């Protein structure tokens, strides 16, 4: 559990949340941070731009628990000048295995092709220079098999953001657990007034 890790000294207490300057600096060569729990896209999108050291200093390993942290989506805008091309573009970006494998190879990102990711795991061409020649798909592909996708709703992303914000104060020792829960409930009801009750697991 995250609080146990924090209390044991496994987490860097100077990093106050995600997507901020502290977090970005924790990925630099000056940092003493040992590891980050990232989704596949975190390597190229987050870690690589913040790293100023040598290639090969980072690697991928199995996580303590399989999880899914969203993905990338493609949508067509109402009023596009090219409505006749929308379907073909979306299919090319989401359902064409050759295109998906190009994305995976260039960005070390896990894409929407189960058989393609399985093949990438055993293909040396998918090794990453940034990861010192490691093929991250050797880890991604088998771990992905165990991810359970819960039903998603229009509220999921907002709830994840708000629970991270509310419990950041708890992890930093500013509030107790019950206060963090209460702060989350307040934040949810402010953002989504139509949600009238929050049920916590027993």
Protein language model regions, located:
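Extracytoplasmic ligand-binding clamshell segments of periplasmic binding protein
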Residues: 1-49, 55, 84, 180
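Tryptophan-centric aromatic hotspots in well-structured domains and transmembrane helices
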Residues: 1-2, 23, 41, 58, ...
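Conserved C-terminal helix/tail region of periplasmic/extracytoplasmic solute-binding proteins
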Residues: 4-7, 138-202
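Structured segments of extracytoplasmic/periplasmic soluble domains
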Residues: 4-9, 26, 49, 54, ...
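Flexible domain-boundary/linker segments
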Residues: 15, 19, 106-107, 180, ...
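Structural recognition of the beta-strand scaffold that forms the well-ordered cores
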Residues: 34-39, 59-62, 74-76
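C-terminal lobe and pocket-closing loops
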Residues: 44-53, 64-70, 75-165, 199-200
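Proteostasis/folding factors centered on peptidyl-prolyl cis-trans isomerases
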Residues: 58-59, 145
């Amino acid at each position: 559990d995250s609080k146990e890790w924090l209390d044991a000294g496994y987490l860097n207490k100077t990093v106050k949340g995600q997507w901020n300057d502290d977090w970005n600096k924790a990925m630099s060569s000056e940092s003493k941070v040992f590891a980050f729990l990232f989704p596949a896209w975190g390597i190229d999108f987050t870690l690589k731009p913040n790293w100023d050291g040598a290639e090969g200093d980072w690697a991928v390993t199995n996580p303590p628990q399989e999880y899914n942290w969203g993905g990338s989506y493609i949508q067509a805008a109402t009023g596009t000048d090219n409505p006749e091309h929308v379907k073909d573009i979306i299919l090319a970006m989401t359902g064409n295995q050759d295109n998906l494998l190009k994305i995976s190879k260039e960005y070390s990102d896990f894409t929407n092709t189960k058989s393609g990711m399985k093949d990438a795991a055993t293909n040396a061409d998918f090794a990453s220079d940034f990861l010192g020649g490691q093929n991250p798909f050797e880890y991604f592909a088998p771990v992905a098999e165990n991810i359970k996708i819960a039903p998603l709703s229009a509220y999921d992303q907002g709830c994840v953001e708000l629970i991270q914000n509310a419990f950041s104060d708890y992890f930093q020792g500013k509030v107790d657990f019950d206060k963090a829960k209460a702060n989350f409930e307040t934040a949810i009801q402010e953002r989504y007034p139509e949600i009238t009750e929050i049920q916590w697991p027993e």
